[in-house]
Amino acid sequence: MLAFTEVAYRGLLIEQDKRSAHRYVDSYEELKGKTLLDIGAAEAIFTLDTIEYIDHAYLFECDESWIEALEATFAPYKEKITIVRKYVSDVNDEDNITLDTFFRDEGKSIDNLFLKMNIEGYERIALEGAVHSLEHGRQIGGSVCIYHLHDDKKVIESELKKFNLKTSIQPGYLYFEKEMRSAIIRFWS
C-alpha cells in the first residue's frame, strides 16, 4: 500500500502532466529568464520544476506548515527564491498585500513576469490588486486557476481582457463541486 506522501506526490505529478487540465504551461521553456510569482505556493512543486529556467521566484505562502519545507527544499537555490508570508489580495494590511504594492515597495520591475495563481477562489480578488502591474507590465503572462468559483472562467477571462491580454483556456476539465469545469486560463501580453 502506498504511503500518503507517495499518493500526494503522484497527484502533483499528474496535475502538471502535459495532458492535464490543470497544467500551468505548455513548456517550462516559456519561463526562461522570467520572474515567477508562485501565488499560493504550497509545496511549490511548480517553482521547483522551473527553477533552472527562471531568474527569480517569489513564493507567496501563508500556511506556516509549508514554510520549513519550502526553506529546506529551496536552500540550494536561496539566491533565486524569496518566500513572502502574505496573502495576495486587493488590500494591504498585516496579513495581505496587493501585487502592485509588493512591486512598488520592493522596488522591483513589473516586466518579464509569470504569475501562477492557485489561491482557492481568491484569484479574482488578487487580480484586483494587480491592476497597475497588468496594465503596465511588459512581457507579462501567467496561469490562473478558474475552477474554484462557479463563474471564475467568465469573470477572470473578462478581467484579463480588460488589460488587452491574450487568453487561452487549458484544454480539458476537472470535476469540482459536482460540475465539469475548465481548470486554467493562461494569459500573455
Please report, for each region that a protein language model flagged, where it lies by residue.
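S-adenosyl-L-methionine
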Residues: 1-60, 63-109, 153-154, 158, ...
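Intrinsically disordered, low-complexity segments enriched in Gly and acidic/Ser/Thr residues
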Residues: 95-96, 102, 126-135
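Canonical radical SAM enzyme core domain
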Residues: 60-68, 123, 148-151
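Short helix-capping segments at alpha-helix termini
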Residues: 75-80, 107-108, 134-139, 162-166
